[in-house]
Amino acid sequence: YVASYRPLVEFAKSHFVPVIAANASADIVRCIGRQGTAYIDKLYSTEKQQIAKQPFAEIPDYKVKFYNFLEKVRQLPEKRKERSYLAQITRDNTMAESIYQAWLDHPEHKIVHLNGTFHSENHLGTVAALKRLNPKLNIQVVTPVQVEQFETIEKLNLDPNLNNDFIYLVKPQPEQYVDASYKRKARQQMFEKSEQATCK
């Protein structure tokens, strides 16, 4: 939040721009990742409002991409992989419904949604879930690409399968602004908190 979202939230606050938290509750997503679809039945009606009405609605081609990603980062048993995927699509479907509801409430507004790259890369994830809700929506994906030197697009070694509408080139943060020990500590605290959290 501090590095990626806070500057924009502060900008929005100071310019009176409305902001919505589009994602699903982290606690609910975590427990879906542990228990699967059955966890939904344990939620109170107020808790169910914190996730999509159809949290497990399938997103074409996304499962293959997600499983390929998991294979690269860690080996999980099949059941755990499936539950991780269910948690992931709960996030994407919830963000899509939140965006769509914001558009229904304010159709004259442009909506800017921020998310991690995986959620919108190649128009999958949240983008595909939003298109399912309304195929006529005009959705554009803007993807940041970190580069050492600004080059022409042809000289960049971009993934040829990347199918996003726009990319913008950003230089990495200066070394003095990147505190690796702080990042490690923050991630460790996040994972410890996650492990300690209990599900119903």
Predicted segments — roles?
Residues 1-102:
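A substrate-binding/cap region within the structured catalytic cores of diverse enzymes
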Residues 18-22, 111-114, 138-143:
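Structural recognition of the beta-strand scaffold that forms the well-ordered cores
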Residues 28-33, 39, 62, 67, ...:
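Generic local-structure boundary detector
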